[in-house]
Amino acid sequence: METMSRRAVLAGLVAAAAAPALAQAKTNPRRIDVHHHSEPPFLLERTRAALLASSPYASDVVAWTPERSLDQMEQWGIETAIISNPTNWSALGADGNALCRRTNEYAARLRADHKGRFGFFGSVPLPDTDAALSEAAYALDRLKADGIGLVTSYGDKWPGDPLFDPLFAELNRRKTVVFIHPTAPGCCSRLIPGIPAPTVEFMFDVTRCITSMLFRGVFTRYPDIRFIFTHDGAALPMLADRITRNASVVRSAGFGSQEAAMRVLKKLHYDITTSTSRPALTALKTLVPVSQMLFGSDFPFLKPAETVPGLDKFGFSAAELNAINRGNAEKLFPPLRA
C-alpha cells in the first residue's frame, strides 16, 4: 500500500506539472496572421517622413523590429505572421523597383531566420506592369513567397483597370493567393483636412477596389486567384446589395442576375483586422460564411489587442473561432498546416 501510495503521489505530481502546458495547448489558438507588416531599415530611410506625416500610428511603425513582432505574436497566440509591405514603389523614384526587390529578399531572410514564425506576400512595383510581372516571378519562384501583395489603387487606377490584366492572368495561371491592402487614392488622400487618410479613405478604397474588380469581371475571368481583402471588406457588407444590383444591369460586368454577382462576393476572403465590433462582424457574417474569414492584426500600425477581444466576445462557436484564427488560412497556405 505504501508503494502504491508513493506511485499515486508521483503520478499526481507529474499531472500537476503537465496541467499548465495542457491548458495552454487547449487555449492557445495558434493564430495565422495574414495582415502583418515589416518595415526594413533601408526602406524606412526613404519612407519615414511620409509615414510620420500620414499615419497617427507612425511612431510605432518606424520603431518596428522583428523582435517587436515576435513579442506581440507570443502575447496573442499568433504562431505565424504573413508579412506584407504596402509601399507605393513608384513614389520612391528611379530606385523604387530595386527597393521592392530588396524588401522581398528581406522578407525571405526573415522567414528563414525564424522558421515557422513568418511567411510573406511578395511586393510588386505596379503600375509598371512588366516590372511587376518580373518581380512576381522572382518572388514566387526564387524566394517562394506565399502570395503576392497589392494595394487597392495606384494613383488614379484601381485593379479593375485593364492595366492589371497581364499580372492577373499570370497570377491566375499560378493559382496565387493575392492580398490587397488599403491605401488612399490620388484623388482623396487629403480630401478632408485634418483627418488622416487611414481613418476613412482606406476603408472606402477597399470598397472601390472590390467594386471596380466586380464591374470589370476580374473575379470571374481569373477564378483561380484567391483574393484576400482587409478589414471585413470595409463598407462592402453594408453596400453589397446596392453594388451587386447595379453590377447585374451593367452588361460589361457579365452577370445575368444580382444573385450571380453576390455569389462572387461570397467566394472572396476577408480578414477581420481591427474590425471586430459587433456591427462590423454582424455585417460580414451576413455577407459571407465563416469559411471566408481570416485573422489579421495590422501590426505594427495597430496591435492584436485591437482585434482579438472583439473577435473572442462576438459569439462565434469554438469551431468557428478555430477556422478564423487558423483553419481557413491553412487551406490557403498548405505549408502552414500543423
Where on the chain are the PLM-derived regions?
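Mid-to-C-terminal alpha-helical segments outside catalytic/metal-binding sites
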Residues: 2-30, 34, 40-80, 106-112, ...
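Active-site neighborhood of phospho(di)ester-bond hydrolases with catalytic His/Asp-centered motifs
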Residues: 32-34, 84, 121-122, 149, ...
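Histidine-centered divalent metal-coordination motifs
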Residues: 35-37, 181, 231
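Active-site environment of divalent metal-dependent phosphoester hydrolases
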Residues: 39-42, 88-91, 127-128, 156, ...
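H/E-rich (His + Asp/Glu) clusters that bind or coordinate divalent metals
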Residues: 188, 195-214, 221, 226-338
